[in-house]
């Protein structure tokens, strides 16, 4: 028992591990909450699109000498607006528009990045570096997360109605277009805050895995939120510990655990259905 406690406590004697854990936990909660809405709306590809599209914004922000999160956020919103414009003003379907917009923006980002940065910096942006999070970056992530949490709390029922049935939301006196872009804005903010943990490539997993894990286990939205948060927080905590003891990528460990939790939930739900019959 003492040995197990030592294994758990040992990493957190270092300040960089404390920052990493706190950042991962904060991001896990926000991703889990938003994940439930994205899964219900069927926006998994939208999360992937915006997460890749932030790269040129990061590069341009670096060149301009402004905070990278500002560039990432603006770039993410530009991607969302671009997809919306193509969908409304052409015969292109939304998923096709996402594919061309995010791949084009990601390619622009890669070209720009190779001209001004080394491969080491590129790896940091693509795959994240939560172990390198400073106290200032932790506070910045916490502030962004708090904004997202408050907005989701205030508009929880409106977003839920929009995700289930936009037509019903319109009849209820809500603006589906406003809710659409509001949810996209929250998605862009979440991606910006998550980028430091798992990078732009793996961020979509943190935005989808908690939601589909919860949806596999329950049909009630309130319960879904709780399960998503528990699975995401547990994966982040264990992922940070595993990455320390096995000298592995922290972001990858977190994503692997979330994938494992989904598989366990899927198997459990199948067994439960068979037993009921």
Task: Outline where the language-model segments fall.
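Cytosolic-side transmembrane-helix boundaries in multi-pass membrane proteins
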Residues: 251-277
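Transmembrane alpha-helical segments in multi-pass inner-membrane proteins
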Residues: 201-252
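Small-residue faces within membrane-embedded alpha-helices
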Residues: 24, 28, 32, 59, ...
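Transmembrane helix-bundle core of multi-pass membrane transporters
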Residues: 4-19, 90, 97-157
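Helix-loop-helix "hairpin" substructures at the membrane interface of multi-pass membrane proteins
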Residues: 138-210
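Loop-to-transmembrane alpha-helix initiation sites
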Residues: 20, 68-76, 95-99, 142, ...
């Amino acid at each position: 028992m003492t040995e197990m406690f030592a294994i758990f406590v040992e990493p957190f004697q270092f300040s960089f591990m404390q920052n990493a854990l706190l950042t991962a936990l904060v991001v896990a909660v926000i991703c889990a909450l938003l994940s439930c809405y994205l899964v219900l709306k069927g926006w998994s590809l939208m999360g992937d699109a915006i997460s890749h599209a932030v790269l040129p914004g990061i590069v341009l922000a670096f060149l301009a000498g402004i905070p990278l999160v500002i560039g990432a956020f603006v770039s993410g919103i530009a991607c969302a607006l671009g997809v919306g414009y193509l969908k409304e003003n052409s015969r292109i379907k939304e998923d096709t528009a996402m594919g061309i917009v995010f791949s084009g923006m990601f390619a622009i980002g890669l070209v720009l990045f190779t001209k001004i940065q080394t491969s080491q910096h590129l790896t940091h942006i693509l795959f994240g570096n939560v172990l390198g999070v400073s106290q200032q970056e932790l506070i910045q992530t916490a502030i962004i997360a708090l904004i997202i949490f408050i907005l989701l709390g205030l508009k929880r029922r409106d977003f839920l109605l929009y995700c289930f049935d936009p037509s019903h939301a319109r009849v209820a006196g809500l603006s589906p277009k406003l809710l659409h872009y509001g949810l996209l804005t929250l998605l862009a903010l979440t991606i910006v805050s998550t980028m430091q943990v798992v990078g732009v490539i793996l961020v979509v997993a943190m935005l989808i895995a908690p939601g589909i894990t919860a949806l596999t286990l329950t049909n009630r939205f309130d319960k879904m939120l709780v399960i998503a948060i528990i699975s995401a927080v547990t994966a982040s905590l264990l992922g940070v510990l595993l990455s320390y003891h096995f000298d592995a990528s922290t972001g990858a460990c977190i994503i692997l655990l979330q994938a494992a939790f989904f598989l366990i939930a899927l198997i459990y739900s199948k067994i439960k259905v068979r037993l009921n019959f």
